[in-house]
Amino acid sequence: MLWLPDRGSCSARSPSGMLRGAPGGWRYGRRCGRRRQSCCCCCCCSHVGAPLSFHREASLVSHDGHDIMKQHCGEESIRGAHGYKNK
């Protein structure tokens, strides 16, 4: 089952295709993927065809099995979407 952000929690697409949260940064406090840890942001990525959450400091496994590393809040490289995997 996919992890989905609350309706209306993200707004205004950034140039990278991600969805921004509140003005001035990404939203905090959501849970990520299969890991019960706090998210750095609750944003959506259209590159893989479904919303994903991104963790602040640890990799997580997305719905399609890719590992995605959240490096910096608001500056995410969707490595899984490009065939890269972090461990």
Curated annotation (Swiss-Prot):
<dbReference type="Pfam" id="PF21971">
    <property type="entry name" value="LINC-PINT"/>
</dbReference>
<dbReference type="GO" id="GO:0005634">
    <property type="term" value="C:nucleus"/>
</dbReference>
<comment type="subunit">
    <text>Interacts with PAF1 complex member PAF1. Interacts with transcription factor FOXM1.</text>
</comment>
<dbReference type="GO" id="GO:0000122">
    <property type="term" value="P:negative regulation of transcription by RNA polymerase II"/>
</dbReference>
<keyword id="KW-0805">Transcription regulation</keyword>
<keyword id="KW-0804">Transcription</keyword>
<dbReference type="InterPro" id="IPR054147">
    <property type="entry name" value="LINC-PINT"/>
</dbReference>
<keyword id="KW-0539">Nucleus</keyword>
<protein>
    <recommendedName>
        <fullName>Transcriptional regulator PINT87aa</fullName>
    </recommendedName>
</protein>
<comment type="function">
    <text>Enhances the binding of the PAF1 complex to target gene promoters and plays a role in negative regulation of transcription. May function as an anchor to keep the PAF1 complex on target gene promoters, sequentially pausing RNA polymerase II-induced mRNA elongation. Inhibits FOXM1-mediated transcription of PHB2.</text>
</comment>
